[in-house]
Amino acid sequence: MAKSQNKESPELRTPNRFITDHDASGLSVFNTSIPDALPAQVIGGRDRFHLAYATTTSPVDLTNQSDIVTYSSFLSTPPGIFLPGGSVLRIVDVRPGGESLMHRTESIDYGVVLDGEIDLVLDSGESRILKRGDVAVQRGTNHLWRNRSHTAWGRMVFVTLEAKPIEIDGKLLGGVTGLGMDDTSPAGN
């Protein structure tokens, strides 16, 4: 099978997503109702989001392809960073030297670096360097992501889940705007 490349970042191939399913007899098969290649959503004219999957309930209803129908609807109108009561699986391509704005969402985000080195910077000034295979558990904190390379794209995969509002010393923190992604909202659609 030929390697499918992104025109804007030839070092990163276009990611594929393979969905398993059941045939009429209950045998495990691959679902072919949605193309495998993940389309890219350009964010703020810069970085790219690839929506790999999304659900709107927990537990997820897998009967009669309910979850696949839900996900399919999000391909034309991508969700926000997280979906209330559901989950979002997203691959994020960060341009060379790219940096998000400082932001907070009412979510828990599991992020794994797939390519490159990415800084996770907190509003306290603390930061960590994430290398390929490293995991960040982002728990509703005010943070930004930065690609350390000025010549190569970075890639991360995220699973985001809604979280309860954070309360510190009797004060609700809430979500913070300033995602730096004009075409993406923190929650929902």
Swiss-Prot record:
List the Pfam families hit by this protein, alphabetically. Answer: Cupin_2
Role description: Part of the gene cluster that mediates the biosynthesis of the phomopsins, a group of hexapeptide mycotoxins which infects lupins and causes lupinosis disease in livestock. The role of phomC within the phomopsins biosynthesis pathway has still to be determined. The pathway starts with the processing of the precursor phomA by several endopeptidases including kexin proteases as well as the cluster-specific S41 family peptidase phomP1 and the oligopeptidase phomG to produce 10 identical copies of the hexapeptide Tyr-Val-Ile-Pro-Ile-Asp.
CDD domains of this UniProt entry?
Answer: cupin_BLL6423-like (cd02231)
Q: What is this protein called?
A: Phomopsin biosynthesis cluster protein D
User: Gene encoding this chain?
Assistant: phomC
Q: Which residues are listed as membrane-spanning?
A: none
The UniProt keyword set, sorted, is:
Virulence
Family recorded in the similarity comment: Belongs to the oryJ family.
Q: Which organism is it from?
A: Diaporthe leptostromiformis
The domain of life for this entry's organism is Eukaryota
